[in-house]
């Protein structure tokens, strides 16, 4: 019986431990690079944007790369 276990122990190696991510603290984070402020969204701004006919969505479309979830044709 020990020969049987010996055969398998030679073929199966130890599994490598998954690498742990380093914990990030504040000293590792720098200033934002290439940051462009496009709009401010506060707690009341989102509701006001929908009431004004989607002006917020129009602003975002003008920035490029914006694909709304519902097409304008469906509205």
Curated annotation (Swiss-Prot):
**In what residue span(s) does the CRIB domain sit?**
29-42
Give the UniProt entry's GO cellular component terms: cytoplasm; cytoskeleton; plasma membrane
Q: Single Gene Ontology BP term?
A: regulation of Rho protein signal transduction
Q: Which UniProt keywords apply?
A: Cell membrane, Cell shape, Cytoplasm, Cytoskeleton, Lipoprotein, Membrane, Palmitate
Kindly list the residues that the UniProt entry marks as S-palmitoyl cysteine lipid attachment points: 10-11
- Give one Pfam family, short name only: PBD
The keyword Mitochondrion is annotated on this UniProt entry: no
Note the superkingdom of the native organism: Eukaryota
Q: In what way does this protein cross or attach to the membrane?
A: Lipid-anchor
Query: What does the record give under GO molecular function?
Result: small GTPase binding
Per its UniProt record, what InterPro entries does this chain match? Answer: CRIB_dom, CRIB_dom_sf, SPEC
Show which residues constitute the signal peptide.
none
| Location in or out of the cell | Cytoplasm, Cytoskeleton; Cell membrane
State its role. Answer: Probably involved in the organization of the actin cytoskeleton by acting downstream of CDC42, inducing actin filament assembly.
Q: Which family does it belong to?
A: Belongs to the CDC42SE/SPEC family.
Protein name stated in the entry = CDC42 small effector protein 2-B
Q: Which organism is this entry from? A: Xenopus tropicalis
């Amino acid at each position: 019986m020990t020969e049987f276990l010996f055969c398998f122990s030679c073929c199966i190696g130890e599994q490598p431990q998954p690498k742990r991510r380093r914990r990030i603290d504040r000293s590792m984070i720098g200033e934002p690079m290439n940051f462009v402020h496009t709009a401010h969204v506060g707690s009341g701004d989102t509701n006001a944007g929908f009431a004004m006919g989607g002006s917020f969505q129009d602003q975002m479309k003008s920035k490029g790369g914006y694909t709304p979830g519902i097409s304008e044709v469906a509205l």
